[in-house]
A protein has these predicted regions:
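Extended catalytic core of nucleotide-activated donor transferases of GT-like folds
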Residues: 57, 85-151
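N-terminal pre-catalytic "stem/leader" segment of glycosyltransferase-like enzymes
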Residues: 2-97
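Catalytic binding pocket for nucleotide-activated donors in carbohydrate/polymer assembly enzymes
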Residues: 153-154, 274, 288, 315-391
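Donor nucleotide-activated moiety binding/catalytic core segment of transferases
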Residues: 92-107, 276-318, 351
């Protein structure tokens, strides 16, 4: 796909019409910097504003029990609003009068992707806290070096291209007042990528559920139902990341029927969880032992049930290391990925502890090995625990507590 900006083609430019219209309210964003805001009101959002997931979800659940503050979830998903309210949580539809009022009067914006999941245009003058959504393996934001990537154009070029990207997607270039990280190493990457000066190593709120699986059980009924439906002897989770250049028609080199036969033989369920920005069809066949989870679903409560994680370049494995379970890496397109999509902070083989496969035959053989001797997949040139500690300073369920204290002490 030529002349693209993070996978955006001319045929899809119509979807940016709302962005162009939103520029008309730019003066409102500027004026809101002068408006007083309530420090007790903290508003939360996640991803693209449709889901209840990731770091924002777990910090919100923690903060909702704090009487010192008022915590509100803002979303474009009306069904989610109803669901959260049924659980006794405060939630509002993004474009409702109440949500707009909260967006312009609340002091604290907490998000794990961009301010737009709440409302970028009402965030002027707010205290912005970015929880982000992963310890990076691939380069992100200011550190992206692929020259046709929107972040590269918006950060490292001049002229019309830079102006266009920053005007159409201003939320991509917001510098948060605070950020959190999982280790000193990750903190350094975030400082470089986002330009945020106040970053605390608190750990990720979403990782609390890895250490304490029953935490917030009252609010995780949907996820618990998925866990209870996994009745096979073993469970494997396949969670690849997205591609900047091929989000819609990427072919995954997996022979699904052959894989399904192996899974059936070993009484194993194979879960597929694509990245929220991945629109490719991972599989088309209907297979008895393979299930595809919704892109926006929260997989962290499932980690307690998962016996093996398979990924390519997703940083999810840094979190999964906290389970002490094996990871299988399947970087089948690594050369193309490094040249066309993203470069990486470290050499891939230097931070990926576990076995690797580069084609389906190798992939199949690694799974056969896993079924015979599961822990063998943890054996590699890299020490599993060394990488685990390098990317996770804390190994407890207090990340939300530390994050809350960090935010409160900086207001």
């Amino acid at each position: 796909m030529k002349n693209h900006i993070v996978g955006i083609s001319n045929s899809k430019s119509i979807k940016y019409l709302p962005k162009i219209i939103s520029l008309l309210i730019l003066p409102i964003y500027c004026l809101l910097n002068l408006m007083p805001r309530n420090k007790r009101n903290w508003i939360f959002g996640s991803g693209v504003g449709m889901s209840f997931s990731d770091n924002a979800k777990y910090l919100f659940l923690y903060c909702s029990s704090k009487k010192e503050i008022n915590s509100y979830w803002i979303t474009k998903n009306k069904a989610l609003v109803e669901s959260l309210r049924n659980e006794g949580l405060k939630a509002y539809y993004k474009y409702s009068i109440m949500a707009i009022w909260l967006s312009i009067s609340s002091k604290v914006y907490i998000y794990d992707s961009r301010t737009s999941c709440i409302n970028h245009w009402t965030s002027g003058g707010a205290f912005k806290v970015s929880l982000w959504h992963g310890s990076p393996l691939k380069n992100i934001d200011r550190d992206i070096t692929v020259k046709n990537n929107a972040f590269y154009l918006g950060n490292h070029t001049f002229g019309l291209k830079r102006y266009f990207v920053r005007m159409i997607m201003p939320e991509w270039f917001v510098v948060a007042d605070l950020m959190i990280a999982t280790s000193e190493k990750v903190k350094g990457y975030f400082n470089s990528a986002f330009g945020c000066e106040k970053i605390e190593v608190t750990g990720y709120p979403r990782n609390d559920i890895i250490i304490s699986p029953t935490l917030y059980a009252k609010y995780l009924v949907f996820e618990q139902n998925i866990i209870e439906s996994l009745t096979t002897k073993k469970t494997i989770l396949y969670a690849p990341t997205f591609r900047d250049t091929n989000r819609f028609d990427r072919k995954t080199p997996i022979e699904w029927e052959r894989l399904n036969d192996l899974l059936k033989k070993n009484d194993t369920t194979f879960l597929i969880k694509l990245h929220r920005h991945d629109y490719s069809m991972a599989m088309k066949e209907k297979c008895s032992h393979i299930r595809v989870l919704d892109n926006e679903s929260d997989m962290y409560p499932l980690f307690s049930k998962v016996d093996l994680l398979i990924t390519d370049y997703s940083s999810i494995f840094f979190d999964f290391l906290l389970t002490d379970k094996p990871v299988l890496f399947y970087p089948y397109d690594i050369d193309d990925y490094l040249t066309k999509d993203r470069s990486m902070y470290d050499k891939y083989d230097n931070v990926t502890p576990g076995h690797k496969a580069y084609d389906f035959n190798g992939f199949y053989q690694k799974l056969e090995l896993f079924f015979k001797e599961p822990n063998v997949l943890k054996e590699s040139v890299l020490d599993y625990n060394t990488i685990k500690k390098m990317y996770n300073k804390h190994n407890d369920s207090d990340a939300s507590k530390r994050t809350y204290q960090f935010i409160a002490s900086n207001l």
